[in-house]
From Swiss-Prot:
NCBIfam families: argB. Keywords: Amino-acid biosynthesis, Arginine biosynthesis, ATP-binding, Cytoplasm, Kinase, Nucleotide-binding, Transferase. It is found in: Cytoplasm. GO terms for cellular component: cytoplasm. It holds the Pfam family AA_kinase. GO terms for biological process: arginine biosynthetic process via ornithine; L-arginine biosynthetic process. It is an enzyme of class 2 (transferase). Its EC number is 2.7.2.8. InterPro entries: AceGlu_kinase-like_sf, AcgluKinase_fam, ArgB, Asp/Glu/Uridylate_kinase. Pathway: Amino-acid biosynthesis; L-arginine biosynthesis; N(2)-acetyl-L-ornithine from L-glutamate: step 2/4. This is Acetylglutamate kinase.
């Protein structure tokens, strides 16, 4: 196998990730893949901001990040959430290392709109050489979405965006979105494979609805460059079976017949 696989864990599912999830990461690595995990941490940041009585607002889904908010975000993402994921991986027998985009200039960013969003950045460069070195040595890097600009100032970055940038920079073959659902269901049955066109049809007919719509559209948007497949899996269960098969819904560029 030997391919880079980027796994994005949203903040909303981090606390509920089961032992089976971490076992699946170990199994994926044992099959020869080279996993890299990118995590969010929105709910944990919200909780700490509330505890410290720091106000926070959102603009078009992005957290407006002032000096105070950034300090809390960096503390929670890098110091708490990141290390929690690393410890759970190590407990499952996975050699892992926790990093942020600041470490080794892993994720260089530029401000999106400082006047409106404050210290919120978008990736302009990923240090793929460092990540390749780590995975070649058997590590699973766990990345917190804090990056630095050209002046080495920290910026808050959307975790989905970081995952996409890492996947592109390292020419990953697959990007896995870890959610709280098994994948896309139709008539209560898991749909194992779809094309982007089939996804849009399921949205139009109402099979895909609510919070799943932005998840699948984000997945489709990620299908660029060498990325051949984006999968949606359940973090509360095994997502990589002993047979070597991914359990979830995989969206691929090329035409797939999901039935039969």
């Amino acid at each position: 196998m030997g391919d880079i696989v980027v796994i994005k864990c949203g903040g909303s599912v981090l606390d509920s990730l089961s032992d089976s999830f971490f076992t699946s990461v170990r199994r994926l690595q044992a099959e020869g893949a080279k996993p890299i995990i990118v995590h969010g941490g929105g709910p944990a940041i919200n909780g700490m901001l509330a505890k410290l009585e720091v106000e926070t607002t959102f603009v078009d889904g992005l957290r407006k990040t002032t000096d105070s908010v950034l300090s809390v975000a960096e503390m929670v993402l890098c110091g708490q959430t990141n290390k929690k994921v690393v410890r759970k991986l190590q407990k499952a027998g996975v050699k892992s290392i926790g990093l942020s985009g600041s470490d080794g200039e892993l994720v260089r960013v530029k401000a999106i709109d400082e006047a409106i969003l404050g210290y919120v950045g978008e990736p302009v460069h990923v240090n793929g050489e460092l990540l390749h070195m780590l995975v070649a040595d058997g590590f699973v890097p766990v990345l917190a979405p804090i990056g630095v600009n050209d002046e080495f100032e920290p910026y808050n970055v959307n975790a989905d965006t970081v995952a996409g940038a890492v996947a592109t920079a390292l020419q990953a073959k697959e990007l896995i979105f870890v959610t709280d659902v098994a994948g896309i269901l139709k008539d209560d049955e898991l749909v194992p494979a779809l094309t982007p066109e089939e996804v849009e049809s399921l949205i139009e007919e109402g099979t895909i609805y609510g919070g799943m719509i932005p998840k699948v559209r984000s997945a489709i948007h990620s299908l660029t460059g060498t990325l051949e497949a984006v999968s949606i899996v359940n973090g509360n269960d095994v997502f990589f079976a002993e047979s070597g098969k991914l359990i979830g819904t995989t969206i691929k560029k090329q035409v797939i017949h999901s039935q039969g």
